[in-house]
Each structure stands twice: as C-alpha cells, then as structure tokens.
C-alpha cells in the first residue's frame, strides 16, 4: 500500500493544475516535500535483582568473583561475575557508589520497593510514589497497544517493603506484575477475543458504566469534607485512567496483534517453570525483547527476585541452580570465602542471562529500514537496591 511521502507520491513544487488553456500553479502541499525521516522510538527497560552482589577487595582470595571490574573508565577488566558482558562492553557502563538519598535511612532488607521511585517510605507510612518507568509509560501512552509490560518472577504486588513489582502508578500504588509466560504471550501476541463485535460491545458497556460512575462520584464529592474530597479526587483520577485505557482499547480493537516468525516462536518456552531458573528467566527476557521488537510497548520492567524471604519463587533460584543457599542466605555470606564464590556464581548466572538479552537486542534492527538496532534505541537499567548486607 502506498503511503503519502513515499517516492511514488511526491509532487514537484513546479507542478501545475492544467485545464483548457489554463495553467494554475499549485500551492505548497505536504506531498511536495520529501518524506521527513521518522525518528526511531526510544524504549526503556529496567531489570532488578535483590540482596546485593559479591564485593571482594583486590587482596581477597576470591577477588576474581568480585562484581565490580578492575580499573576505571574504558580501561577495565571484567571479573568472573560480569565476564559474560565482555562482548557488550562498548554498550555497558558499570556504576557504583550510587544510592537514593531518601532511601538511605531504610533498612537494607526494605529497599526493593524504591528501585525506580527513590521514595522515603518511612515518612509516608510505607506509601510509595510513581516509578520512573510509569512516567515514561505516560509519555508514550497511546503510541503502542500497551503502555508498559510489568513482569516479575513472583508476580502480583507483594507487600510494602517486600514488593513483587517494580512499577507504581501516579498515586504510588503497585501495579501487579505478570509472571506466567503463557499469560504474557497471550496478552501481547495471542489472537484475543475471536468475536470482535462482542469485545466492542463489552468496551462500549464499560465506557457507559464509567460515565455513570463519574457522574455519581461528582455529585458525592460536593457533599464531602476536604480530606474526603482529596480521596474522591484520587478515585476519580483512577477512573479517568480506566476511561483512557478503554478508549485506547477501542482504537486498537481492529488492528491485528503482531505476528511472530517460526524462529521467534521456537525460542519461546511458554511452559517454562520458575523451578527451572535458566529456562524461566530466559523466556521472560525473550518476551521483553519481542514486546520491543513488535513495538507492542516501549516500557518494560522485570523483577528477577524480590526482597521477600526464602519462600519466594525467585529466592529459591540459587538452590535450584545448585549454587548453594537460598538467595537471602547467600547474600549474608558474601564476606566468607565459600559464600563469596557462591554469590559470585549467582552474579554470573544473572550476567549470562542479561548478556543473551543484550545479544537479541543488538541483533534486531530498530525498524524495517533502520541502520540502528533495538539496543541502540533502548535505555536499560540493570541493577539492585543495595550493595551488601
């Protein structure tokens, strides 16, 4: 299908409308100009893991398992922990000594909720603020089918200081994370409701219901005190956000979801279970890559494990990998010889998975006619909420 702006639909500025004995110069039209280059969309990804990394001094007998590279600037050498990132050293910047000023007073076990918010939970009765990924999601709202992709190994929201999501809406409320690969795939790439007319009626019904809710809430607000008015305003704002989502869903309902190649499908292991960490984490990364590749969303977060105790799904990963203790216990042994190596091996596992994701992003063009790659157009934050316990 031809598009305005393509070479086959450009007019020279000297073109004329010609009639019988008449030649009328055309006014400047958009189609006369050459097609302006379309800027490749930017993307944001945030990947988080808890409980610190293996910190080893140069004189330590386990120095090779120290997380931070040797040297500074561009002249550095990866230790065993981050060696899998060697192929991407030109695209990777390793930063240390950073912290959220407002989070320094919070206990090390309680800082996972603040990775993307930097919020002082203690002074706000454990009520968070909006996460940076959701600020970006609002910026891109409507440009993609989904504003963001929020994932975690444990799924849901968890509880304050033990959150199982990285993402918080504009009111500081946690956004439930998805953790079932098949569920994520169906939402982003599945056929959806086979009866489009029924789906359209459902969306229309939802819109009508929201109109009634807004009307009733507006009447109620006028009879409330100042504090309750603030609460109802917050509620109304939430309803408006739902309205916007319904409106966007109506706009996208007749647009087919992106198709995937056989090779893309073969890489996915949608039956991957969190009891097999290597397959599970790889699949979550692959889903993130596909979401970016198809421009289904431009914002994604993945919490590999939470700050919860040893019973969490992600917390069991080291044991399932045969590295040693559960993640919490592993972190507490960081300053012991055996513990330093075990924690370093966990760090390396994470780096291997991350490196594979970077490979996929680097080998995928940012667009059909683009010389850039997805990695070129994506800011990726990969890190944790504390150095050591």
Q: Over which residues does each language-model region extend?
A:
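Ligand-binding pockets and gating/stacking loops
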Residues: 1-387
